[in-house]
C-alpha cells in the first residue's frame, strides 16, 4: 500500500504544476531548497551544542582554592603636562 510508483509520481508532479503554475514553480523549489539548507544547519548546530556539554561539566568541577591573588602595585601612568598652543588665531582680545 505504501509503494509509490512512476504513475503516481507523474500525477503528483502534474497536480503541483497545475496548483503553482510553471512560472512560480522554480521560485518555490528555490525557496524549499533554502529552507532545507537552513533546517539542516540548525540541526547540525543543535548537535554541536550538545557535544561540548560533558566537557563543560568537567571544567565546572570544584578546584582547590588557594586565596585571592596578590594585587599588583598601582603606579599611575606618567604623562607630560599639556602645554597650551601659542600664537595662532585665538579668541583673545589684546
Curated annotation (Swiss-Prot):
It is a single-pass membrane protein. Its main location: membrane. It is found in: Cell membrane. One of its GO terms (biological process) is protein transport by the Tat complex. The keyword Glycoprotein does not apply. Keywords: Cell membrane, Membrane, Protein transport, Translocation, Transmembrane, Transmembrane helix, Transport. GO terms for molecular function: protein transmembrane transporter activity. Residues 52-69 have a biased composition (Low complexity). Residues 50-94 are annotated as: Disordered. Belongs to the TatA/E family. The Tat system comprises two distinct complexes: a TatABC complex, containing multiple copies of TatA, TatB and TatC subunits, and a separate TatA complex, containing only TatA subunits. Substrates initially bind to the TatABC complex, which probably triggers association of the separate TatA complex to form the active translocon. HAMAP family: TatA_E. Part of the twin-arginine translocation (Tat) system that transports large folded proteins containing a characteristic twin-arginine motif in their signal peptide across membranes. TatA could form the protein-conducting channel of the Tat system. This is Sec-independent protein translocase protein TatA. The gene is tatA.
Amino acid at each position: 500500500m505504501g509503494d509509490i510508483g512512476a504513475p503516481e509520481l507523474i500525477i503528483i508532479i502534474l497536480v503541483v504544476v497545475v496548483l503553482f503554475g510553471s512560472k512560480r514553480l522554480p521560485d518555490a523549489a528555490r525557496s524549499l531548497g533554502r529552507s532545507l539548507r537552513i533546517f539542516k544547519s540548525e540541526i547540525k548546530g543543535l548537535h554541536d551544542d550538545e557535544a561540548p556539554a560533558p566537557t563543560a561539566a568537567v571544567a565546572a568541577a570544584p578546584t582547590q582554592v588557594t586565596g585571592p591573588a596578590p594585587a599588583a602595585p598601582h603606579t599611575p601612568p606618567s604623562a607630560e603636562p599639556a602645554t597650551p598652543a601659542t600664537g595662532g588665531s585665538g579668541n583673545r582680545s589684546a
